[in-house]
Amino acid sequence: AQTTTIDVGAAIFQIPGRTPANCAMTAATLDTLSGGRFRLGLGVSGPQVSEGWHGVRFDKPLARTREYVDIVRMALRRERVSYDGEFWQLPLPDGPGKSLTLTVHPVRDSLPIYLAAIGPKNLELCGEIADGWLAIFFSPEDAAGLMEPIVAGRAKVDKTMEGFDVVPTVPVVPGKDVEACAELVRPYAALYVGGMGSRDKNFYNQLMSRMGYEQAAIEVQDKYMSKDYAGAAAAVPFEF
């Protein structure tokens, strides 16, 4: 290892891409290799990726996320995993499976878990069950509205915001000309706002609309879905 103090983040492990047990095994291994410096980021993804890439139905994403985090935490505490949920039953009730314990010994039995959340209900869930939030397109001007459901989620479990991490995802372009640098970020924003999801269900597009750029969000999506990628990028407002 070349570092000793900097933490290692997972960015976003897609929940439909790994079983909870596989996720816990991966997290425990990375925590061990880093000497207790790993931070686990999770996200439920969206219907196109979940169903088109992973073959997992995108139904009840909030309930699925809750169960997933429950099981991951249980496994990382090295408890015998026995879970009777809507999406996961461990062990399966009609076969030879039995409750098992994680064989890897993580440095800590309570790894920090971050959720990538966008919608108000997912943000509230994040505040309730996670240790931090992985934010995209975070704006200080919109922080109060975005944080409100997280604060509500914390309150549901009698917790304050103390110790809760807010981690904005910020694309960085070095340079002295701000507008020229923004041109390099526009295609990145257009990909998410215009192409990540369907016309009816694109969480990034909905976020852009909630931030006050509804007409721009429509234009970016229209152009992107028409394969006018350059036009979609150009339609992303500089202020966004």
Regions found by a protein language model. Name each.
Residues 1-240:
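Active-site-adjacent structural elements that line small-molecule/cofactor binding pockets in enzymes
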